[in-house]
Design a protein with these regions (language model features):
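Catalytic-core elements of nucleic-acid end-processing and repair enzymes
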Residues: 1-121
Length: 121
């Protein structure tokens, strides 16, 4: 019960802190990069991608924005952006690997970092 109450609070805090990014959508025509918008999305991302984005509670990191890079409905990589330095901390595919689109995803996010920066103001 205590854990559920904690998660509810984290969910509310996450929405309060990160909702300004929820309309963000970066695309190069094939790849689309969007923010994770809820703890449920973090959980699903972690399960599908077989990595620790949910279990290590990245939703609690105030200075991180977690993005999901996709082609259609298929998740390709999960991207962590530092909201203080506006640098990509990591971008991981299934099982913490890299995808064939890794460099393209990095370029897409870096190219649009000014947009992310503008949303933090």
């Amino acid at each position: 019960m205590q854990r559920l109450l904690e998660l509810k609070k984290y969910a509310e805090d996450y929405i309060k802190e990160k909702s300004k990014f929820f309309d963000l959508k970066l695309s190069d025509g094939k790849i689309v990069v969007i923010p994770l918008k809820s703890l449920e999305e973090f959980k699903k991302e972690g399960e599908i991608m077989h990595h620790c984005v949910f279990s290590n509670e990245y939703f609690k990191k105030k200075d991180s924005l977690i993005l999901s890079a996709r082609i259609g409905s298929k998740r390709i990589e999960t991207v962590e952006v530092n909201l203080k330095s506006f640098q990509i901390v990591q971008s991981r595919a299934v099982c913490n690997g890299t995808s064939e689109y890794h460099d393209r995803i990095i370029r897409l996010v870096e190219k649009n970092m000014s947009l992310i920066k503008k949303l933090t103001a």
